[in-house]
Design a protein with these regions (language model features):
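Extracytoplasmic small-molecule ligand-binding "clamshell" domains
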Residues: 31-104
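N-terminal secretory signal peptides that target proteins for export/translocation
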Residues: 1-5
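Ligand-binding clefts/hinges and TM-proximal coupling segments of bilobed small-molecule sensing domains
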Residues: 151-166, 263-313
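Bacterial N-terminal signal peptides
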Residues: 10-25
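Short helices/loops that flank or line small-molecule/ion binding pockets
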Residues: 78-96, 109, 190-217
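A ligand-binding cleft/hinge motif common to bilobed small-molecule-binding domains
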Residues: 97-110, 163-169, 202-231
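Periplasmic-binding protein-like
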Residues: 35-44, 111-112, 116-132, 181-187, ...
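Bilobed "Venus flytrap"/periplasmic-binding protein-like clamshell domains
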Residues: 35-64, 126-201, 275-276
Length: 313
């Protein structure tokens, strides 16, 4: 019964929702590419939690887009970038909120383009920090040959895509390890996924791996890097800044809808009625135009992601 219940819940989440509440309807009816419907998408491993984060902002946006014919909103989750790419190409999703790395993957496949930067907790850009134990003898990325590094998970921008790309740019070859006890071949950098920032800092502190990576925001958070650990660590490199998150739209979205969506999202930060919806939307504080610096950072990140997919994964 539990398994059946989970399958039913997953099905209802895929079916999406109207602007007021989820509806029970056949799949094709719920995701039809109606001109009056704005569909917000997200690549998700936790659809229920993400639905609750997305819905308030969608509820805020839709009534403000009546002038371009939008009267209804729906949410559609995808399990991975490939499925989301399919949704975008087929017009089943109009707007996607994603990490910078995932956004560049969708853009590379030609199904979406960046709309706005997303500022969360007052931060629109961040960077990746590489760190090691002070007594490790590691002072730079060049010292990582024959050593090991802990990433977070294979979807993380700050704790996988950016640092892995940085290592490749330094001429280092990455080799996945079976466990922290495994050692890389001579001349390569062995890597593992630790699943959380706290695990990363713990593994480095306990010498299970030689180097860890995370965003500068997580590096400064004592819940991710306990103060008892920090005194034993040294930062060996910090990357350039890159966007924290992006809003994407499908490549063939009606220009009038795209323009109005951009306008509504940018103006939301100054509207008291949007405050709670923005907070629920991954603690968003405002949406920002994509300037030349952000474009360059996204292009560099996108090239790195494609190189990782070709040479590492």
């Amino acid at each position: 019964m539990v398994a059946l219940h989970r399958r039913l819940v997953a099905l209802l989440l895929v079916l999406g929702a109207t602007i007021t509440a989820p509806i029970l309807a056949p799949l094709q009816a719920a995701i039809a590419n109606d001109a009056h419907v704005l569909v917000l998408g997200r690549i998700s491993d936790d659809p229920k939690a993400h639905y609750e984060q997305l819905k308030p902002l969608l509820d805020y946006v839709v009534p403000r887009m009546a002038g371009v014919g939008i009267r209804e909103g729906r949410i559609l989750m995808a399990r991975d970038a490939q499925q989301m790419n399919s949704y975008l190409r087929r017009g089943r999703v109009d707007w996607v909120t994603e990490t910078a790395a995932m956004g560049t993957q969708l853009q590379h496949r030609g199904s979406a383009r960046p709309l706005l930067l997303t500022e969360r907790d007052g931060v629109s850009r961040y960077r990746t920090v590489f760190f090691a134990r002070r007594d490790s003898g590691i002072a730079s990325l060049a010292d990582l040959r024959g050593r090991s590094i802990a990433f977070q998970n294979p979807f993380s921008t700050s704790a996988y895509y950016v640092p892995a790309s940085e290592l490749l740019d330094q001429g280092l070859r990455l080799e996945i390890l079976l466990s922290p006890m495994d050692r890389p071949a001579s001349g390569t950098v062995g890597y593992l996924f630790a699943r959380s920032e706290l695990n990363i800092s713990t593994w480095v502190h306990k010498r299970l791996v030689d180097v860890g990576v995370m965003s500068n925001l997580d590096w400064q958070n004592p819940q991710r890097v306990p103060l008892a650990f920090r005194k034993d660590f040294i930062v060996i490199r910090e990357t350039q800044e890159y966007p924290r998150a992006v809003e994407m739209v499908r490549s063939n979205l009606d220009p009038k809808v795209e323009a109005r969506l951009r306008e509504v999202l940018v103006e939301a930060a100054g509207d008291p009625d949007a405050r709670e919806a923005l907070l629920r939307f991954f603690k968003t504080t405002r949406f920002l135009p994509i300037d030349a610096t952000a474009e360059q950072a996204l292009a560099h990140l996108g090239a790195g992601v494609q190189r990782i997919r070709a040479e590492v994964e």
